[in-house]
C-alpha cells in the first residue's frame, strides 16, 4: 500500500505473474499495478521497458512524474520500441503458457526424484517461478550450470557463485538469454546458503524449456 495525498492506495508489483491466473490484480482490488516487459508481458520479444496499469488518475500522476509535469502522456519519444512492445504483448499468453508447462514438467520430474518443490506440479500457480530445494550446495550449483549449458546464448559459459549487491550470500545464476536479464526465456538462480534452493523460471517454448530441464537434471545425477 502507498499514500497518494491523504488516500491509501493498493500498489502491486506483478512481475512473473501476468497471464498466469484468470484475473489480474486490478480486477480484484489493486489501484495500480506495475511490471517488467522483459518478463511475462514482453513475450520474450521486448528487450527493455516496463508498464503501469490501473486507475486513470494514478496513471496520470505517474506519467507526469516519469515524463514532464503538465504534459503527462501527451508527449515523449517511443524510440521505435512500440513495435516490439505490442508484438511481445501479442505473443505473451502463449509464451507464459510454455513457461507454465516447463514449470509443471520440472516439478513433476524433480519431485519424482525426491526433491522438494514449490509449487507442486498439480498445484495452482500464481507466477512462473518454481522453487527447488536441494539441501546440497554442489547440486544447486550443478543444476544451475545445467540450465546455462542448455541456453540459447552463452551455453558454453559456466556460472560461478559470487557476491552480488543486496545479498548476504553468494549467488549463482544462469540466464543465457537473447535479452540480458530476461527471465521469461529460461533462467535459474539461487543463494548459496542452506537449504540451497534454486528458483527456475521461464521457457519461451515448452520444447526449449524441456531440453533445459532435462539437461539440468542430468547434471545432478
Segments and roles (model prediction):
Residues 12-15, 36-38, 55-56, 189-190, ...:
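Fold-independent oxyanion-binding glycine-rich loops
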Residues 19-25:
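Catalytic cores of alpha/beta
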